[in-house]
Amino acid sequence: MARITVDDCLKRIPNRFDLTLAAAYRARQIANGAQLLIDSNAGSKDKPTVVALREIAAGQIGREVLERAIRS
């Protein structure tokens, strides 16, 4: 499994603070049982934070997570 770096994720969400908030929010969703948006085999061994970063790097999750969190 390839390592996910912050630089991979910053290509999708350029602001480090927004990236941190989005990854933390998505990791919390995953930990609470949300459906994974990437290959489920990869997520079975990884912690929710790593899965969230993989989703961001793959372009499956972006700033819209933060916008939804603010509205709710």
Curated annotation (Swiss-Prot):
Substrates-to-products reaction catalysed: RNA(n) + a ribonucleoside 5'-triphosphate = RNA(n+1) + diphosphate
Q: Does the keyword Nucleotidyltransferase apply?
A: yes
GO terms in the biological process aspect are: DNA-templated transcription
Q: Which GO terms describe its cellular component?
A: DNA-directed RNA polymerase complex
The terms under GO molecular function for this entry are: DNA binding; DNA-directed RNA polymerase activity
Residues spanning the signal sequence:
none
Q: What is its EC number?
A: 2.7.7.6
- Give the UniProt keywords, A-Z: DNA-directed RNA polymerase, Nucleotidyltransferase, Transcription, Transferase
**What HAMAP family does its record include?**
RNApol_bact_RpoZ
Q: Which family does it belong to?
A: Belongs to the RNA polymerase subunit omega family.
Functional summary from the UniProt entry: Promotes RNA polymerase assembly. Latches the N- and C-terminal regions of the beta' subunit thereby facilitating its interaction with the beta and alpha subunits.
Q: What quaternary arrangement does the UniProt entry report?
A: The RNAP catalytic core consists of 2 alpha, 1 beta, 1 beta' and 1 omega subunit. When a sigma factor is associated with the core the holoenzyme is formed, which can initiate transcription.
The record's NCBIfam families line, in alphabetical order, gives: rpoZ
Q: What is this protein's record name?
A: DNA-directed RNA polymerase subunit omega
Which gene is annotated as encoding this protein in its UniProt record? rpoZ
